[in-house]
Amino acid sequence: MRRLPEQLLHPARRRAAIAALQARRAPTSVLVLCNGNIYRSPFAAAALRRALGGPEGTVAVDSAGFQGPGRESPKEAVEAAARRGIDLTGHRSQLVTPDVVRGAELIVVMEAEQRRAVRERFGRSPRDVILLGDLDPEPITSRSIVDPWGRRATVCAASFGRIERCIGALVKALRHAPADRAA
């Protein structure tokens, strides 16, 4: 019963998120954030880079988190990502800072609380921060993309699957965004 509002609101939130992305100028830089920058955001950033055409594409994609820098992605994250063709072996977590946030035209987060934190702590406009789960093309039970930290490997695999679906929708929306419209 608790998740019913999320399910009912999702279609409208999805339409609004896609419309907002398509109404803005296509970004040249994207920052993907999650709590620790060891599971969701590094995977999402790598998936976005791949979907946009690789690391040398026209859009710079980076990731960061709200907790300690310099940490490796856990074994289960590396393995789950590898099964999806993404290499996280060299990833080290990066702490989100004002400079990192300032350098991004679009910020993608995994949870509503993170969206709020970016807006409050770093003064970013709501239009610059998108909740990735709002783009999910499938019915949902939660806007947030589940944090696999401390959970079974199956949770990591499911989170990565949802991230890939949402990244596909994000890329599709960005490809329909005007290249020359003012941000």
Predicted regions and their residues:
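Conserved active-site segments centered on acidic
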Residues: P5-G103, A173-A182
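Short beta-strand scaffold positions
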Residues: V32, V109-M110
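Phosphate-binding/catalytic loops
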Residues: M1-A16, R116-A183
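Short, flexible active-site-adjacent loop segments at beta-strand->alpha-helix junctions, enriched
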Residues: G36, R92, Q114, L135-D136
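Conserved residues at the C-terminal ends of beta-strands
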Residues: Q67, M110, L132
